[in-house]
């Protein structure tokens, strides 16, 4: 199972958009690979619609979506057709037809529940590194806005060398400010409060993102 900071495992897969190499075909782009237990199930259907409703928001931040389950491609295709015909939502992102080997490699098989994959989420960066891993039980649908927020804050943290507070940009303590990494020596700690940051103490300083 890939851990944070690992290279995402090289996978050659079949999808509803044709063959794909993951993460090779995604290099240079952020991506969210999310698994679902099975096609033609209610919670999964609501999740796919919710992801599709946010495709443009993910694209705007340079992030691609890829679905996955242990179902065959023809099942994925038929399910996508059903969603279009009955819910008037056109699923535009690819869906991987995984097998047990791939699912086990990613740690996505639910113990005691056969070949149904758990609701896993992997966020990969443009270098193919695993940056975030989430697992949800079969009974609970995911919060797509939180996944979108997580990708955004990872990008901001990388670009600005800052840490992001809880619930950013709506943190109750520091609102939309970002956190300055704590000083790592005594001299820097002394200087920290002299710099133009808002500080509760030398180890807890924050600032506006654009400052």
UniProtKB/Swiss-Prot annotation:
Which reactions appear under catalytic activity for this entry? a hydroperoxide + [thioredoxin]-dithiol = an alcohol + [thioredoxin]-disulfide + H2O
Q: Which SUPFAM superfamilies match?
A: Thioredoxin-like
Q: Which Pfam families match?
A: 1-cysPrx_C (PF10417), AhpC-TSA (PF00578)
Q: Which cysteines are joined by disulfide bonds?
A: 199-205
Q: What biological process terms from GO does the record include? A: cell redox homeostasis; cellular response to stress; hydrogen peroxide catabolic process; response to oxidative stress
Q: What residue range is the signal peptide?
A: none
Miscellaneous notes: The active site is a conserved redox-active cysteine residue, the peroxidatic cysteine (C(P)), which makes the nucleophilic attack on the peroxide substrate. The peroxide oxidizes the C(P)-SH to cysteine sulfenic acid (C(P)-SOH), which then reacts with another cysteine residue, the resolving cysteine (C(R)), to form a disulfide bridge. The disulfide is subsequently reduced by an appropriate electron donor to complete the catalytic cycle.
Q: What does this protein do?
A: Thiol-specific peroxidase that catalyzes the reduction of hydrogen peroxide and organic hydroperoxides to water and alcohols, respectively. Plays a role in cell protection against oxidative stress by detoxifying peroxides.
- Name of the protein in its database record: Peroxiredoxin
Lineage, opening ranks: Bacteria, Pseudomonadati, Chlorobiota, Chlorobiia, Chlorobiales
């Amino acid at each position: 199972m890939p851990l944070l900071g690992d290279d995402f495992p090289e996978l050659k897969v079949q999808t509803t958009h044709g063959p794909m190499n993951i993460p090779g075909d995604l290099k240079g782009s952020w991506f969210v690979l999310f698994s679902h237990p099975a096609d033609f199930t209610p919670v999964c259907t609501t999740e796919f619609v919710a992801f599709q409703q946010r495709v443009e928001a993910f694209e705007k931040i340079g992030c691609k979506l890829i679905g996955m389950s242990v179902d065959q491609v023809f099942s994925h295709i038929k399910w996508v057709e059903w969603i279009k015909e009955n819910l008037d939502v056109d699923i535009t992102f690819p869906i991987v037809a995984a097998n047990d080997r791939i699912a086990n490699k990613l740690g996505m098989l639910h113990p005691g529940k056969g070949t149904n994959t758990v609701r896993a989420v992997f966020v990969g960066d443009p270098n193919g590194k695993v940056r975030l891993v989430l697992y949800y039980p079969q009974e609970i649908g995911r919060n797509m806005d939180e996944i979108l927020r997580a990708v955004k804050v990872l990008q901001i943290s990388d670009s600005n060398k800052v840490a992001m507070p809880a619930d950013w940009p709506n943190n109750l303590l520091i609102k939309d400010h970002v956190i300055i990494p704590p000083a790592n020596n005594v001299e820097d700690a002394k200087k920290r409060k002299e710099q133009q940051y808002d500080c509760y103490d030398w180890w807890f300083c924050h600032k506006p993102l654009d400052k």
